[in-house]
């Protein structure tokens, strides 16, 4: 009986793909070796311990319908579009060895005519007249009896958009999280014009089979034809939830300040796991009472634009004479934290 398993996703949904990856990883026999090939539509994928408000331009992501997905491995933030080919290698211990999967990807690139090398922070690079350029980045996860190595190959990614979403607004964030290292990158199409996702997947698959000396039929999966994965519905619900993607952020502080015609405002937030644990308001407004009430009510509020806006607008009941000021304040807060 073969020890290999090959899965290929037809879905571009990052939450679906990451949920599939998580379920396979949890339920696979320790003797199995798995290759999972997939790709995501427009998504910023962040590491398990990263702060999305620190790493991402969340406002632009919302405007452009770009999703946020938190993965279960460590590492930095990356932008995925359909110009990225994603791979995941899984194996039980002691078979699991990330140098093996790195070798398989390098062999696949070599078979396509691209000479690449492993470098530094889990990257694969190619040499160009402008110096080394990154074509692949990876992250890893290990448990007691198994491990996985997943990463992306930059095929024909829109690199200008990558910069748009991974360069955050100059917010005054004093974060305890880590800001990712930005890397010089290149697309494989610069080296191999016309190369396709299917060709890259085929090359990785053949290198996988060649390394282990076995072949196996691919299992093609999508939301309409998922494999038998225990607890998939629960895993997908968690993967797609705000609580996981945003609420798992490290503790951080955020300062907002603005001057209105009726006075200047400073709001200070301390946020833990996506919830405001402390809020302070400072103002030279002639009537500071609404802001004082807002600071009190924001404690315990989810750090989401819609929730902050709801809390602010709820004050209209208690301060109807300050409707203009409160509506201006509400619109500003909602825009500032996106």
Curated annotation (Swiss-Prot):
<feature type="binding site">
    <location>
        <position position="134"/>
    </location>
    <ligand>
        <name>ATP</name>
    </ligand>
</feature>
<comment type="pathway">
    <text>Protein modification; protein lipoylation via exogenous pathway; protein N(6)-(lipoyl)lysine from lipoate: step 1/2.</text>
</comment>
<dbReference type="InterPro" id="IPR019491">
    <property type="entry name" value="Lipoate_protein_ligase_C"/>
</dbReference>
<dbReference type="GO" id="GO:0005524">
    <property type="term" value="F:ATP binding"/>
</dbReference>
<feature type="domain" description="BPL/LPL catalytic">
    <location>
        <begin position="29"/>
        <end position="216"/>
    </location>
</feature>
<dbReference type="GO" id="GO:0005829">
    <property type="term" value="C:cytosol"/>
</dbReference>
<dbReference type="GO" id="GO:0036211">
    <property type="term" value="P:protein modification process"/>
</dbReference>
<keyword id="KW-0547">Nucleotide-binding</keyword>
<feature type="binding site">
    <location>
        <position position="134"/>
    </location>
    <ligand>
        <name>(R)-lipoate</name>
    </ligand>
</feature>
<keyword id="KW-0963">Cytoplasm</keyword>
<dbReference type="InterPro" id="IPR023741">
    <property type="entry name" value="Lipoate_ligase_A"/>
</dbReference>
<dbReference type="Pfam" id="PF10437">
    <property type="entry name" value="Lip_prot_lig_C"/>
</dbReference>
<keyword id="KW-0436">Ligase</keyword>
<dbReference type="InterPro" id="IPR045864">
    <property type="entry name" value="aa-tRNA-synth_II/BPL/LPL"/>
</dbReference>
<comment type="subunit">
    <text>Monomer.</text>
</comment>
<feature type="binding site">
    <location>
        <position position="71"/>
    </location>
    <ligand>
        <name>ATP</name>
    </ligand>
</feature>
<dbReference type="InterPro" id="IPR004562">
    <property type="entry name" value="LipoylTrfase_LipoateP_Ligase"/>
</dbReference>
<dbReference type="Pfam" id="PF21948">
    <property type="entry name" value="LplA-B_cat"/>
</dbReference>
<dbReference type="GO" id="GO:0016979">
    <property type="term" value="F:lipoate-protein ligase activity"/>
</dbReference>
<dbReference type="GO" id="GO:0005737">
    <property type="term" value="C:cytoplasm"/>
</dbReference>
<keyword id="KW-0067">ATP-binding</keyword>
<comment type="similarity">
    <text>Belongs to the LplA family.</text>
</comment>
<comment type="pathway">
    <text>Protein modification; protein lipoylation via exogenous pathway; protein N(6)-(lipoyl)lysine from lipoate: step 2/2.</text>
</comment>
<protein>
    <recommendedName>
        <fullName>Lipoate-protein ligase A</fullName>
        <ecNumber>6.3.1.20</ecNumber>
    </recommendedName>
</protein>
<comment type="function">
    <text>Catalyzes both the ATP-dependent activation of exogenously supplied lipoate to lipoyl-AMP and the transfer of the activated lipoyl onto the lipoyl domains of lipoate-dependent enzymes.</text>
</comment>
<dbReference type="InterPro" id="IPR004143">
    <property type="entry name" value="BPL_LPL_catalytic"/>
</dbReference>
<feature type="binding site">
    <location>
        <begin position="76"/>
        <end position="79"/>
    </location>
    <ligand>
        <name>ATP</name>
    </ligand>
</feature>
<dbReference type="GO" id="GO:0017118">
    <property type="term" value="F:lipoyltransferase activity"/>
</dbReference>
